[in-house]
Design a protein with these regions (language model features):
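Gram-negative bacterial Sec-dependent N-terminal signal peptides
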Residues: 1-20
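Periplasmic alpha-helical coiled-coil/stalk elements that build and connect Gram-negative outer-membrane
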Residues: 2-3, 22, 143-265, 373-376, ...
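A glycine-/polar-enriched beta->alpha junction
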Residues: 29-39, 46-61, 97-105, 109-127, ...
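Amphipathic alpha-helical coiled-coil segments
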Residues: 38-55, 142, 146-165, 176, ...
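Membrane-embedded beta-strand positions of outer-membrane beta-barrel proteins
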Residues: 41, 63-67, 276, 298-302
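Small/polar, glycine/serine/threonine/aspartate-rich low-complexity segments that form flexible
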Residues: 66-110, 241-254, 288, 301-340, ...
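Acidic, low-complexity, intrinsically disordered peripheral segments
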Residues: 71-73, 231, 428-473
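Short, charged, amphipathic alpha-helical segments
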Residues: 129, 192-201, 346, 412-420
Length: 473
């Protein structure tokens, strides 16, 4: 007993026990940590946060400054001027001229501006907030796509493992049948044609096993690219869940529930539809930015500036200096844009119509996908029951054939056929469970309900399935 416990502990320490087998949720958690798709989703969310911050600050005041220096020249002339001196009468018809041919000059200015009213800016604010929400939806869509891709590659690896193991065992069985045929031919019990048929079957099975080995390597590498697992040390994967787990997976007491509930859920929660609806809202705000009167602006403005120029002019040394400031309200109303603004507004309205048409088309497509997937799952339940019954019948036939082989009523070839039939039935059931699991996840994704709990429920919590052959007698 002590030796048995030590062996069991050693197996568990090496990760061989069934408790160490990875399920679909484990694969997703690994993919979430390292797949570039999640980095893209995180970047999309960060971009959305930046757009939301832009919307919050779009009405904040702005301050701009400018300065310049260089060689400058200036000439001013005034005619018909008048001036007066203290204690003397005004003198009219006077002319003044100043000039600086070339000299050092400086100029600076500063302006502070705060928008008070702008339909275009208001539409831009709403558009930025909608774009921020759109980024969140797009990031969620990227995450959901990675979930479905992980599930697809996970189940592909499970089926490749199953098919490869099946063909390896079939190859072992055909090798035994070939050896038996050769022995019986040597003893004179069978003709040479039986040996040739056994050789042909052995070669065909070996070729199929080699092809299955290649498919298995491809499936493992594809899963490794998604999860970051080492393809040279593949994980033990849990098989897809049985059909009996359907009700728990779907969160309904009566299996799938009516298709109308899934259609309603998809109409409100489907990420593709929500994203497309958000694009329609963004297009509407883009059109509002170009609407008539949207370019009218009212700003609170404060300005200050100065200019200085010195040098020699026509009448000797000279210098000019000027300072100005202004605080007030500035109103800008476009009166005529040459028709370009109207054409731009028409273009954006048509683009809004296009976005709405794309949304209507997406609704039809999603509804069709929901209906088709729901029907597939409905039919799949009966198909699963039939395959389970076929597996039980094949196992019973295998047991009977094995017993008959022991008492001499059945031949080795009959035992091999019964064994292959049982393994094929097991493989078909596992493949159907994988298709059903993927269809369930797809339906949940269409309804916007795909999450980690659904991924975990998609795989069997029991011991990983491994096809096996009875010992040769």
């Amino acid at each position: 007993m002590r030796k048995l416990l030590l062996c069991a502990a050693a197996l568990l320490a090496c990760g061989v026990g069934p408790a160490q087998a990875a399920d679909l949720r484990d694969a997703w958690l690994a993919a979430r940590q390292q797949h570039p798709g999640m980095a893209a989703a995180a970047a999309e969310r960060a971009a959305g946060d930046a757009r939301r911050l832009q919307a919050e600050r779009i009405w904040n005041p702005t301050v701009a400054a400018q300065a310049s220096a260089g060689a400058m020249g200036s000439r001013t002339s005034a005619q018909g001027a008048a001036f007066s001196l203290p204690g003397s009468a005004p003198v009219a018809g006077v002319g003044f001229e100043t000039s600086v041919h070339s000299g050092p000059g400086t100029r600076w200015g500063i302006e502070a501006r705060m928008p008070l009213y702008s339909p275009e800016r208001s539409a831009q604010e709403r558009q930025l907030r909608l774009s921020a929400d759109l980024s969140e939806l797009q990031a969620a869509s990227l995450q959901q796509q990675l979930m479905l891709q992980t599930a697809e590659r996970y189940f592909a690896a499970v089926l490749a493992e199953q098919q490869h193991a099946l063909l390896v065992r079939q190859q072992q069985a055909t090798d035994r049948a070939l050896q038996e045929a050769r022995d019986r031919f040597t003893a004179g019990d069978t003709p040479i044609t039986d040996v040739r048929e056994a050789e042909a079957q052995a070669l065909a099975t070996a070729a199929q096993a080699e092809a299955a080995s290649v498919d298995l390597q491809i499936a493992r590498r594809a899963l490794a690219q998604t999860t970051g697992w080492d393809p040279a040390a593949p994980q033990t994967l849990r098989p897809p869940a049985a059909v009996s787990a359907l009700a728990e997976t779907m969160g309904a007491a009566s299996a799938l529930g009516p298709v109308t509930s899934w259609l309603d859920g998809a109409a409100h929660e489907n990420l593709q539809l929500r994203t497309q609806a958000q694009l329609v809202a963004v297009a509407a705000q883009e059109a509002a930015k170009a609407a008539q009167g949207a370019s009218t602006k009212v700003d609170l403005v404060g300005q200050a500036g100065a200019e200085h120029l010195s040098g020699s002019g026509r009448w000797g040394s000279a210098s000019n200096a000027a300072r100005q400031f202004m605080v007030g309200v500035q109103i800008q109303v476009p009166l005529y844009t040459g028709g370009q603004q109207d054409a731009r507004a028409q273009e954006l309205l048509r683009l809004q119509d296009k976005a709405q048409a794309n949304l209507d088309s997406a609704r039809l497509e999603v509804a069709q996908q929901v209906h088709a997937t729901w029907l597939q799952l409905q039919a799949g339940v009966a198909r699963a029951h039939a395959l389970e019954a076929a597996l039980k019948a094949a196992q019973a036939r295998l047991d009977a054939t094995q017993l008959g082989r022991q008492v001499g009523d059945r031949t080795t070839l009959e035992l091999l056929r019964a064994t292959n039939d049982a393994l094929q039935a097991e493989s078909q059931l596992l493949a159907h469970r994988a298709r059903m699991a993927q269809a369930r996840l797809q339906l949940l994704a269409l309804a916007g309900r795909l999450d980690e709990s659904a991924l975990q429920a998609a795989t069997d919590a029991g011991t990983p399935v491994s096809p096996s052959l009875p010992p040769s007698s």
